[in-house]
Amino acid sequence: MNTLTRRRFLIASGTAGVAAAAAGAGLVGWHTLAQRATADPLPPGSRILVIVTLYGGNDGLNTVIPYTDPAYHSARPDFAYTADQVHQLDGQLGLNPAMTGMAGLWTAGRLAVVRGVGYPHPDHSHFRSMDIWQTASPDSPITTGRIGRWLDATGDDPVRAVNIGSVLPPLAVGAKGAAAALTLGRDTLPADLAAAITGLGAADPSDTAAQVSVATSYCSERTVASTFSPVLGAPVTPPAADDPSPAGSAGGHSNLQQQFDLVARCVKAGVPTTVYTVSLGGFDTHADEKGTQETQLAALDTAASSPTWPATRTAVAWW
């Protein structure tokens, strides 16, 4: 039987060095980040961006609705909304009836709507369209995302951008590193596996550059868990199998409210993260378009308009 030593494991992992580095992100040790999270937290009032990705192709016309436009009603006679059904923003536009909380934010002056955001010659493929939105490259596919390139350009701190969920979206992957991926709840790795990861990430003066890169990714995984562990407290229980709350596509089996609650707890604790990414799937609606979309938008509305949110934050929903 062959023995899998640390060195042989890192050499084998080197064939996927970019993926491993992206998964772990960052080039700093967990001790440094733990000290920063307690001794130098994010200053109160700092601007924080929360990006909400809606997977599946949300129907924008039935989200921000041109309820007075005859062309809108003519094009979709079976599932258009009338003036008395929408949350009217002005004399022409209204929000989907499921978006009661956001309508309240609009009235309070805390919600802005930007319409018509896109790119020339839209691609009608769900997959290519989402790739374009996440990479901001409409002309040709690239391997880095918008937030990933920001991380590349501004430093290598693995908790400056955090994705809630174990699946890191292309948005958060750069050429040199990536955002950290944080699962709901505390670090749930078995003790023996956690110890193995710590050992893999330990420095060794004989490592090659490629092995250092891979080892760093394992070290960074422990960094994220150690930095956030005091904030997370008790683990968040995943929803039951019959929970009607929609699940996040890149957010694992968690619903959007759980993801937002976790972000809010981190923000209130002063964790030094300025960009969070969360997600909600299930927007590829066909049959029962209105009912299905209303369920999804209600989940978004409840999470984004929750009164538990800190006063200083920005939420961006990709529709």
Where are the regions a protein language model picked out?
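Acidic/histidine-rich, metal-coordinating catalytic segments
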Residues: 316-319
